[in-house]
């Protein structure tokens, strides 16, 4: 069993999603958004750090998964996003959580099957995969999708390791 915290970083809205993985079964534990309504960036970063720390304390995740920075057309926006990611990662590292990063295209490909999927498609698939009664908020759905991606990637890595071990022992032909 593992609890995974997914984070969709943003300087104004940071989505989070928490799921439990038992074997191949995924279950929803919680999700939402950390909203920073103050104007100055240092105060927003402080709120993101405090919010992520509180979520970690509440859910006690085993793994922390976050979306990688994409190349934005606006350099200022990309820098602010990078800083928001940074404080979220520091919150995880301060709690000694292993951090995993996933590209947005990889997350969409894993959850929807199309790397260029729309937000509404991600929301629908997250709802379906986690058997939720309604679509989660867009940023929370993205965070849940990041957590789901971590489960799939780590499960595939474990299966590959087991196959290599069996091959080394001469069990696969």
From Swiss-Prot:
Outcome following mutation: residue 105 to H: Loss of DNA repair activity
Annotated consequence of substituting residue 8 to E: Does not complement deletion, loss of Holliday junction (HJ) cleavage, forms dimer, binds DNA, dominant negative to wild-type (wt)
Result after altering residue 67 to Q: Does not complement deletion, very low HJ cleavage, forms dimer, binds DNA, dominant negative to wt
Activity across pH: Optimum pH is 9.0 or pH 7.0-9.0.
Major location category of this protein: cytoplasm
Highest taxon in the source lineage: Bacteria
Alphabetical list of InterPro entries matching this protein: RNaseH-like_sf, RNaseH_sf, X-over_junc_endoDNase_Mg_BS, X-over_junc_endoDNase_RuvC
Effect of deleting the gene: Loss of Holliday junction endonuclease activity. Increased sensitivity to mitomycin and UV light, almost normal conjugative recombination in wild-type backgrounds. Suppresses lethality in dnaB temperature-sensitive mutants; ruvC cannot be deleted in recB-recC temperature sensitive mutants.
Details of cofactor binding: Binds 2 Mg(2+) ion per subunit. Mn(2+) reduces cleavage sequence specificity. Cations are not required for DNA-binding.
Assigned EC number: 3.1.21.10
Pfam families, per the entry: RuvC (PF02075)
Record key words, sorted: Cytoplasm, DNA damage, DNA recombination, DNA repair, DNA-binding, Endonuclease, Hydrolase, Magnesium, Metal-binding, Nuclease
Gene3D superfamilies, sorted: Ribonuclease H-like superfamily/Ribonuclease H
Effect the entry attributes to changing residue 115 to N: Inhibits endonuclease activity, forms RuvA-RuvC-DNA complex
Cofactors: Mg(2+)
GO MF terms held by the record: crossover junction DNA endonuclease activity; DNA binding; magnesium ion binding
Catalytic residues in the record: 8, 67, 139
GO BP, sorted A to Z: recombinational repair; replication fork reversal; response to radiation
Gene Ontology cellular component list: cytoplasm; Holliday junction resolvase complex
Record note on what altering residue 139 to H does: Loss of HJ cleavage in Mg(2+), poor cleavage with Mn(2+)
Sequence similarity: Belongs to the RuvC family.
HAMAP family given in the database record: RuvC (MF_00034)
The record's note on its domains: Each subunit has a cleft approximately 20-25 Angstroms wide and 20 Angstroms deep, which is sufficient to accommodate dsDNA. Residues thought to be catalytically important (Asp-8, Glu-67, Asp-139 and Asp-142) line this cleft.
Additional remarks: The dual incision reaction has defined structure and sequence requirements which must be satisfied for efficient nuclease activity. These requirements are biologically important since they serve as a control mechanism that prohibits the nuclease from cutting DNA at structures that could bear a physical resemblance to a Holliday structure.
Name this protein carries in UniProt: Crossover junction endodeoxyribonuclease RuvC
